[in-house]
UniProtKB/Swiss-Prot annotation:
Protein name: Cytochrome b
UniProt keyword DNA repair present: no
Amino acids binding a ubiquinone: 201
Cofactor(s) listed in the protein's UniProt record: heme b
Top-level taxon: Eukaryota
Subunit-structure text: The cytochrome bc1 complex contains 3 respiratory subunits (MT-CYB, CYC1 and UQCRFS1), 2 core proteins (UQCRC1 and UQCRC2) and probably 6 low-molecular weight proteins.
Keywords, alphabetical: Electron transport, Heme, Iron, Membrane, Metal-binding, Mitochondrion, Mitochondrion inner membrane, Respiratory chain, Transmembrane, Transmembrane helix, Transport, Ubiquinone
Membrane-spanning residues: 33-53, 77-98, 113-133, 178-198, 226-246, 288-308, 320-340, 347-367
Cofactor, free-text remark: Binds 2 heme b groups non-covalently.
InterPro entries, A to Z: Cyt_b/b6_C, Cyt_b/b6_C_sf, Cyt_b/b6_N, Cytb/b6-like_sf, Cytochrome_b, Cytochrome_b_C_euk/bac, Cytochrome_b_N_euk/bac, Di-haem_cyt_TM
Family according to the record: Belongs to the cytochrome b family.
Amino acid sequence: MASLRKTHPLLKIANDALVDLPTPINISVWWNFGSLLGLCLIAQILTGLFLAMHYTADIATAFSSVAHICRDVNYGWLIRNLHANGASFFFICLYLHVGRGLYYGSYLYKETWNIGVVLLLLVMMTAFVGYVLPWGQMSFWGATVITNLLSAVPYVGNTLVQWIWGGFSVDNATLTRFFAFHFLFPFIIAAMVLLHLLFLHETGSSNPTGINSGADKIPFHPYFTYKDLFGFVILLLALSILTLFSPNLLGDPDNFIPANPLVTPPHIKPEWYFLFAYAILRSIPNKLGGVLALLASILILMVVPLLHTSKQRGLMFRPLTQILFWTLVADVAILTWIGGMPVEHPFITVGQVASVLYFALFLILIPATGWAENKALKWN
């Protein structure tokens, strides 16, 4: 008689995704980040739920309610710091996951990849509205600056901004709706994650060699369940160390000052995980151009599958494109650094060069090198 996990309608779905899933035998630790992102999402939803029980979405009491959580709620300080630093780890895993996809050609599974890009955008939106909730100086001014970018939309821009604000400035209506969005989005993300997995399991995972692994697969459980659990332990250990030893390392000191519409902070900047996109936005001395570049910096990922010129899938055996990939990694690191710097010489020029290089790598250099490698191997 067949086991219950193979016959029960619900358990069968879980079984096919987590137990009997045929998995390439040679997937490396770079394939761990999908499950780590799942862990991050669950951790963020749980800590967020407990924070929402004590938080008040009102400009008069929002800042005080966060202070109350940290001072008076049992382990409130821990829950709040886990949630804030959990977001940083979420983005670390996200960027590594995307980097893995770019390196090993996972983007050729187009549906999985495009849903992944939508997921990235959703997580970024969620993090943005979440950052506004403590109602500190950087929360308020970050919300003002970023929502104001929509005024660059021709004709309807100003109307759009006032519609999002719910008034003529970032005020109580804005905070209330941002809290509603911040509560809602993670559940939309969870639904999208299921779609992401559904499409992935249509094709199966790729593997480091980039060649078909149909003849060489092993069951997901126990091999990769334990491998994933090991990843969970490392991630939770790192998160615990950051949260317990230096919880405010990645935050902005300005956010310990309650929001004041009359005083602008000297340097308005987002959390570290948005700095690369912020640097690209600032590198164009035109509002609409900057907004378009900001959108393009993420949406360019959707174009990557269309610009794949190589006859090989990944970069494992493509040394020239490898150099360009690591140039891209270095470029994003430089953009992240520039995004946190004031708008003055030489940072402006460095930011502009890094921004041009960012788009050139995706649109010109990597596709051209793929084509050149085909020629060198006489594969055309």
